[in-house]
Design a protein with these regions (language model features):
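Eukaryotic intrinsically disordered, low-complexity regulatory linkers and tails enriched in Ser/Thr/Pro
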Residues: 1-167
Length: 167
């Protein structure tokens, strides 16, 4: 599938590489991310007017129940409906709650960083559920700007995008 390009009001350009959301693809990807790569990612909704940039200090507990993935740090947790669930009789609510779109993305031209690499999920209403940011080659591990990009920091994003978005 060809990437989708979106141009933001802030002058950014985002290239989205969608992945299949049927079956357990999204579940498998998120279990891998939160179980194996938790120290490398930043998580939270990123919407106009609000940005939650949460990083993990220790490995979270990752569980599945009735289609919901729970990521639990002990002090706090969140749930994402990533698979079929039966928690409501309403077919419409089941459709709305479940991930309806998942896409790896690269955004260029922002005011905070020359580029950002991530994964974004939307529900059946088209509302953002979560954004997961991957290591950025323009910054060190303490978010200090590097003089020269370290392109190897995009390997996790590139590898997962290649496996899950098939390109």
């Amino acid at each position: 599938m060809a990437p989708t390009i979106e141009h933001g009001l802030d002058g950014t350009t985002t290239e989205y590489h969608d992945m299949a959301v049927a079956g357990d693809e999204v579940e498998r990807l998120l279990v891998e991310l939160f179980s194996e790569h938790w120290a490398a990612i930043t998580v939270g909704p990123l919407i106009e007017g609000a940005a939650y940039e949460i990083q993990f200090a220790s490995p979270p507990k990752v569980t599945m129940l009735d289609g919901y993935l729970t990521v639990d740090t002990g002090a706090w947790h969140f749930h994402l409906c990533v698979n079929d669930h039966r928690g409501t009789r309403s077919e419409e609510l089941r459709r709305i709650r479940r991930v309806a779109r998942a896409a790896f993305f690269k955004t260029e031209g922002g005011s905070c960083a020359p580029a950002v690499w991530g994964l974004r999920l939307w529900n059946g209403r088209g509302e953002q559920m979560v954004t997961i940011l991957f290591p950025n080659p323009h910054f060190d591990d303490n978010w200090q700007r590097l003089r020269e990009p370290r392109w190897e920091k995009t390997e996790l994003w590139q590898g997962l995008r290649g496996r899950y978005a098939h390109g």
